[in-house]
Structure formats: structure tokens, C-alpha cells
């Protein structure tokens, strides 16, 4: 019984550590030709933001703080 409790505690700790470190995905706000961030109105998954991110060379993006955010968008690809 004691081994089961210890095993459960270890599993919980490792899952907490994984969720803390796994949540920070690098990315950037893409900019249009005028240097402005792309606005969006529907927070979270947003097809218009996904389309914008694809124009900038990455596969996925979403609406965050009413601006499109592209995951894994490098600084060199921010502007079109």
C-alpha cells in the first residue's frame, strides 16, 4: 500500500512539472505590410489567424489578446 501511495505522489509531481514546462510555446505576433499586428475578435482557435500564420510560414496560430499569435513564428518571419 505504501508503494502505491509513493508511486502516485511521484506520478503527480512529474505531471505537474511537465505541465509547467510544456505550456510555454515560442512564437510571435505577425505584422502586416504596414507593421501592424493582425486584429481578431474571436479569442482562441480562429481560422483567420491560422490563415495569417500560414502566410507567415507557420502551421498554427490563434487569437490572443485580440491579436493573432503564431506558434513557432521566428523574428525573421514576423513581417511579410
Swiss-Prot record:
InterPro entries in the record: LCN-type_CS_alpha_beta_dom (IPR044062), Scorpion_toxin-like_sf (IPR036574), Scorpion_toxinL/defensin (IPR002061)
A single Gene Ontology CC term: extracellular region
UniProtKB keywords: Disulfide bond, Ion channel impairing toxin, Neurotoxin, Secreted, Signal, Toxin
Disulphide-bridged cysteine pairs: 40-63, 49-68, 53-70
Alphabetized CDD domains for the sequence: neurotoxins_LC_scorpion (cd23106)
Pfam families reported in the protein's UniProt record: Toxin_3
LCN-type CS-alpha/beta domain location: 25-80
Gene Ontology MF: a single term: sodium channel inhibitor activity
Tissue-specificity statement: Expressed by the venom gland.
Designated name of the protein: Toxin Acra1
Organism of this sequence: Androctonus crassicauda
Source taxonomy: Eukaryota, Metazoa, Ecdysozoa, Arthropoda, Chelicerata
Amino acid at each position: 500500500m505504501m508503494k502505491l501511495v509513493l508511486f502516485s505522489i511521484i506520478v503527480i509531481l512529474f505531471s505537474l512539472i511537465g505541465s509547467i514546462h510544456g505550456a510555454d510555446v515560442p512564437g510571435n505576433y505577425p505584422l502586416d505590410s504596414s507593421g501592424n499586428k493582425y486584429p481578431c475578435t474571436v479569442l482562441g482557435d480562429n481560422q483567420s489567424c491560422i490563415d495569417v500564420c500560414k502566410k507567415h510560414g507557420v502551421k498554427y496560430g490563434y487569437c490572443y489578446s485580440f491579436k493573432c499569435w503564431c506558434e513557432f513564428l521566428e523574428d525573421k518571419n514576423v513581417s511579410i
